[in-house]
A protein has these predicted regions:
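Hydrophobic transmembrane alpha-helices and their helix-loop junctions in integral membrane proteins
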Residues: 1-2, 16-188
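Short phosphate-coordinating micro-motif centered on Lys-Gly-acidic
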Residues: 9
Length: 188
């Protein structure tokens, strides 16, 4: 699991720099890159805290071993807290509604190829990690047991679909529209 964290951070560092490259045309790209850096760091911190909680509860960082040991600990508050920290951390990195506030400026002020790269890879990588943890480490039975889908993900997904679609519709800047549309698509 720790290797996943290192991979995410190395790839994130490069995207922060790429967003800042837009400063040649507009100095606001530096602020957008800084906000992206801060939000990405907060997300990474949440993710690492979740990994720490998992290690504390199970004594391993191997995904297969974690899945095996977590299956017996569905009611363990440490495991549930670890799951919450991992979801919030990856939610920030993936710009899932309502944790998406850094995304519109990062898309808008980054150079166009960078915005296209971000929309196609950087945020989707965090979604992959989140889904990998949900279905490989925690297992669907754990998700069903804690009621995450009905109580948290479904309401936010519905709000994201409508609120972000309306926000995208009201935008005049194409890249900002793409950012809001990306958040709405994550809701689907």
């Amino acid at each position: 699991i720790f290797n996943v964290f290192v991979f995410l951070e190395i790839s994130s560092l490069s995207t922060y720099v790429l967003v800042a490259q837009g400063a040649k045309k507009d100095k606001r790209a530096l602020k957008a890159a800084f906000n992206y850096l801060i939000m990405g760091t907060i997300g990474a911190t949440f993710f690492v805290i979740g990994i720490g909680f998992l290690y504390m509860a199970t004594g391993t960082l191997n995904m297969a071993d974690l899945a095996e040991r977590i299956a017996d600990q569905r009611d363990n508050r440490t495991v549930q807290a670890a799951f919450a920290f991992i979801v919030v951390g990856m939610g920030l990195k993936a710009a899932i509604y309502p944790l998406h506030l850094w995304l519109p400026n990062a898309y808008t002020f980054a150079p166009s190829p960078v915005a296209a790269f971000l929309s196609g890879t950087a945020t989707k990588m965090a979604i992959y990690v989140l889904l990998r943890f949900m279905f490989t480490v925690f297992q669907p039975e754990f998700l069903e047991h804690i009621g995450l889908l009905e109580m948290v993900i479904l309401p936010f997904a519905i709000i994201a679909m409508f609120a972000s679609s309306i926000s995208a519709f009201l935008q005049r800047d194409l890249k900002r529209m793409l950012a809001h549309s990306s958040v709405a698509q994550l809701g689907y």
